[in-house]
Amino acid sequence: MLRFKELYQQEIIENLQKEFSYKNKHAIPQIKKVVINMGVGEAIADSKVINNAVNDLTLISGQKPVVTLARKSIATFKLRENMKIGCKVTLRKDRMYDFLERLVIVALPRVKEFRGFSYKSFDGKGNFTFGLKEQIVFPEINYDKIDTIRGMDITIVTSAKTDKESKFLLSGFNFPFYNNF
């Protein structure tokens, strides 16, 4: 079994129960899914770039991503409707916990000048979104085999009703936050 899943079931649930005194065990917040999005603006000029982004995201997430398409044409960016402009993957259950474990333990310590996340990244409904500027912080990515450094957006969707509950939940998973709530 995964360490983060065991950590949630054995410790975090109890801590949340004590802190917020839930009456129903189903009201205790949990992480529902993790969405990783990689926008590839260069794909407008070179369609092969999207394949490299898909390969990188497959290595990082362990799951094949979906290619995202442009919803409407924008002449300024030379963008046409239904052009491939990125890829995303939604992780749930065991793959989600596996990714979060690799993110917190391996990837985040490798980010340059990283001091922690800001509480401003919460959306007011308990979801947490942040961006990484380089995909090479993940050990699955070989620096010599990538064509260019790309960033990604990561959204952690929780069942928490407030940002405070969500912050407490993510702090239980050792997410580094740098300012007070």
From Swiss-Prot:
InterPro entries, per the entry: Ribosomal_uL5 (IPR002132), Ribosomal_uL5_bac-type (IPR020930), Ribosomal_uL5_C (IPR031309), Ribosomal_uL5_CS (IPR020929), Ribosomal_uL5_dom_sf (IPR022803), Ribosomal_uL5_N (IPR031310)
Q: Name one GO molecular function term.
A: tRNA binding
Q: Which SUPFAM superfamilies match?
A: RL5-like (SSF55282)
A GO cellular component entry from the record: ribonucleoprotein complex
Question: What's the domain of life for this entry?
Answer: Bacteria
- Which biological process annotations from GO are given for this protein? translation
- HAMAP family associated with the record: Ribosomal_uL5_B
Tell me, in a sentence or two, what this protein's role is.
This is one of the proteins that bind and probably mediate the attachment of the 5S RNA into the large ribosomal subunit, where it forms part of the central protuberance. In the 70S ribosome it contacts protein S13 of the 30S subunit (bridge B1b), connecting the 2 subunits; this bridge is implicated in subunit movement. Contacts the P site tRNA; the 5S rRNA and some of its associated proteins might help stabilize positioning of ribosome-bound tRNAs.
Q: Which PANTHER family match?
A: 60S RIBOSOMAL PROTEIN L11-RELATED
Please describe the quaternary structure of this protein.
Answer: Part of the 50S ribosomal subunit; part of the 5S rRNA/L5/L18/L25 subcomplex. Contacts the 5S rRNA and the P site tRNA. Forms a bridge to the 30S subunit in the 70S ribosome.
- What is the designated name of this protein? Large ribosomal subunit protein uL5
Protein's organism = Rickettsia canadensis (strain McKiel)
Gene name of this polypeptide: rplE
